[in-house]
Amino acid sequence: MKKRIPTLLATMIASALYSHQGLAADLASQCMLGVPSYDRPLVKGDTNDLPVTINADNAKGNYPDDAVFTGNVDIMQGNSRLQADEVQLHQKQAEGQPEPVRTVDALGNVHYDDNQVILKGPKGWANLNTKDTNVWEGDYQMVGRQGRGKADLMKQRGENRYTILENGSFTSCLPGSDTWSVVGSEVIHDREEQVAEIWNARFKVGPVPIFYSPYLQLPVGDKRRSGFLIPNAKYTTKNYFEFYLPYYWNIAPNMDATITPHYMHRRGNIMWENEFRYLTQAGEGVMELDYLPSDKVYEDDHPKEGDKHRWLFYWQHSGVMDQVWRFNVDYTKVSDSSYFNDFDSKYGSSTDGYATQKFSVGYAVQNFDATVSTKQFQVFNDQNTSSYSAEPQLDVNYYHNDLGPFDTRIYGQAVHFVNTKDNMPEATRVHLEPTINLPLSNRWGSLNTEAKLMATHYQQTNLDSYNSDPNNKNKLEDSVNRVMPQFKVDGKLIFERDMAMLAPGYTQTLEPRVQYLYVPYRDQSGIYNYDSSLLQSDYNGLFRDRTYGGLDRIASANQVTTGVTTRIYDDAAVERFNVSVGQIYYFTESRTGDDNIKWENDDKTGSLVWAGDTYWRISERWGLRSGVQYDTRLDSVATSSSSLEYRRDQDRLVQLNYRYASPEYIQATLPSYYSTAEQYKNGINQVGAVASWPIADRWSIVGAYYFDTNSSKPADQMLGLQYNSCCYAIRVGYERKLNGWDNDKQHAIYDNAIGFNIELRGLSSNYGLGTQEMLRSNILPYQSSM
């Protein structure tokens, strides 16, 4: 489990968060202009076995004990080189040692260098046997990477594994600029373990010290090390001033944790955000526990609840054991329905409407798999809306393909539904679905003929309250059996032609598709709707077997779906263009018998549902993607979306977007506790733009703006300005986003946030502007159209 950790030393010695190259390559090359490189041939092997070469203007000595070299002295052994005005060579034969100890004292313009560091000073010392080196009152410069400083004494130890500074400083800024630096009474840099220990550490901006720590152990490479991560601060209208100081804990090679004290001024307390990651034989996962001991804003708004502890628990796990067992967890739970309105979290959003708590254990071998799961929902609705949970659910699949010309499958499910309210219907549902399929195909087409039988039994309880309510049109039954056969024929053809006359090397395909589907009508009014909703229908969705998800509503069908797709490929077999158009023609009305589904009373037949999708890669920099669905049952265009993007590179892009969803479509496809929310009563009709562009040398701007034409108000706004240099980066951002709905005042609630970040750069090879991360962190995230 690898994780690149930019810790507090990264704050101090230039570890960067962002990974895009774009303009970063230019900046990196500029920064390296002031960094020396090792230009001699690299020597490998034991340097003690290599000869020592000495050049000087003058030499005198007392062989074999000592020698003095003066004038342009140059000593080389392996990758190490020592230069000075004068060098005194001493050689002593220690008792019991086969090799003599050779040391040198260097005076005047001392210069030591190897493939890792350059040391300069007025006085130096070196042990030619161990390669230990001292330079007093000098400067040092890293080789091949940013990093330089000064020290009263600089030492190389352990075959150049350790660099030790006494009263030393470090900065990654280029020569001539000391924007920031770290100073310590002693600094030990271990290259093998990629860690630095600093005693009496002072962090300076210019000449001014702004931070002190008596001891720091900090990572300086890619190895995971415990330490503080880069702090962050911002100001929001819902929490006022916020400050984060994350600490990374490298527990073991297969597990780590990040502990973040998150101070929120308006809440009057610190939220402790704790993330734990692990990798075991049973799989990998992430756990998050966020805890706020008290919240004065929430307590003022909800005085009857008293001292409120607010929290979030998240657990995601995925694993396989012994190649047959599958374990999965997707669990999110919060203390109250307002949690995601009040706090930003990567594990949920106020626009989600609910949180899911799901556990599953599966077993899979060839031709067979079975899964036992439980699923619950926490609805973020103050109106005490009910929701159903599956406690538990068993799904079983058995496959037997190549049974002569046929493929067969048997699917089974057993589930028990429980409601959060005591007066709502509950049920046990058992479903069995055998299927036989005759697949025929070759390189230019395919024909699949399928027949299945869907048998379902319901045992429903707690029906008295529902059946006695005069507002409920359907009367539920205690025991219901439903048996429905299904027959389907699906045929595809692929025609291909060379476009030599219009575009040499290009190829066009034409792919017509026809599907006939028959499902007889069964009255399902006596069955409560526990888990079914209308499925979204893009072009591929037209060819589904089902109109509804789940098993409680299986609509009758006597219909033909027709569609056609054409694609254009260039001479490198890259798809440059495609367009698909299809429709469903109903010979008879599609029904379930549920009087609560209003369009079932319209008795409509004919061509009712149309859908189309298109993609056009206009050039290497321009792309267009669009889709539309028209549903006469909903009396309107159900959904549509378009996206046009110009993308020059990863830091230069402009994208224009349009998205629409009718209110009828939202009510039909989303759960009632979500779709009936006031903010969706007029549907969704938004236009927007996303952009990222460098505006000057090392300056870049990113922004996103979405406007809701139904309410004539902005839906989301984001603007960020960034400056990037060799030794630091600055980012200022503003965001205004939708954060809920005020039912009393009947208007949307917005949150405004201003953020400010400073990142110090240096040893990392990462000089990206980070524009993609800013765009994707938006509440309406950027998605490429290319």
Curated annotation (Swiss-Prot):
What does the entry list under GO cellular component?
A: cell outer membrane; transporter complex
What processing steps or modifications follow its translation?
Contains two intramolecular disulfide bonds.
Q: Detail the disulphide connectivity of this chain as listed in its UniProt entry.
A: C31-C726, C173-C727
Extract the signal peptide range. Answer: 1-24
Q: What is its main location?
A: membrane
**Keyword Disulfide bond (UniProt):** yes
Q: What keywords are assigned to this protein?
A: Cell outer membrane, Disulfide bond, Membrane, Signal
Q: Name one GO biological process term.
A: lipopolysaccharide transport
Q: Where in the cell is it found?
A: Cell outer membrane
Subunit structure of this chain's protein: Component of the lipopolysaccharide transport and assembly complex. Interacts with LptE and LptA.
Its family remark reads: Belongs to the LptD family.
Biological role: Together with LptE, is involved in the assembly of lipopolysaccharide (LPS) at the surface of the outer membrane.
Q: What is the official name of this protein in its record?
A: LPS-assembly protein LptD
Gene behind this chain? lptD
